[in-house]
A protein has these predicted regions:
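Helix-coil boundary and interhelical linker segments in multi-pass alpha-helical membrane proteins
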Residues: 1-13, 63-77, 120-126
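Generic hydrophobic alpha-helical membrane-segment signal
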Residues: 2-3, 11, 15-18, 34, ...
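Structural motif marking the loop-to-transmembrane transition
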Residues: 5-13, 49-52, 74-79, 99, ...
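Lipid-exposed faces of alpha-helical membrane segments in multi-pass integral membrane proteins
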Residues: 13, 17, 53-63, 82-86, ...
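Solvent-exposed interhelical
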Residues: 16-58
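Juxtamembrane membrane-interface segments at transmembrane alpha-helix termini
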Residues: 23-29, 90-98, 117-124
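Interhelical loop and helix-boundary elements at the membrane-water interface
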Residues: 38-40, 44-51, 91-117
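Transmembrane helix-loop-helix
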Residues: 56-101
């Protein structure tokens, strides 16, 4: 049984992985404008690797969230986290160097609020 401190730490770690996962794509957007002195994941390792790292961070986020919420069987949160993961995963997997600024400004930015939206929807429906 997880104690409060461990739950809190895992929850913070989970959020960090989610935030990292959805911010790396902005480095992909900025690759045309970044100077070579700035070492970002897309500049150093390439766009493909950056996308894989971002998606891996999202997988880690989902694993931690499911682990934390299966113990208390918070079904609406598990479903919401899964939907947030799927939504963010899809948006990031569709990234390329030619996406418009609107793609980043709307679709990618909406990943950050998607968990709240899915939580509200699942709370109403379940």
């Amino acid at each position: 049984n997880l104690d409060f401190n461990q739950n809190y730490k895992l929850s913070v770690i989970s959020r960090i992985f989610f935030i990292l996962g959805i911010t790396i794509p902005f480095d992909i957007r900025d690759i045309k404008h970044d100077q070579l002195k700035i070492n970002t994941i897309p500049l150093v390792f390439g766009v493909g690797v950056a996308k894989k790292v971002a998606l891996t961070f999202l997988v880690i986020y989902l694993c931690i969230e499911c682990y934390l919420n299966l113990e208390v069987f918070a079904l609406n949160f598990i479903i919401s986290a899964s939907l947030c993961f799927l939504y963010s995963f899809f948006i990031i997997s569709q990234l390329n160097n030619n996406n418009s600024d609107y793609y980043y400004s709307f679709w990618l930015e909406s990943c950050s609020i998607s968990l709240l939206v899915f939580l509200i929807i699942t709370s109403i429906l379940l």
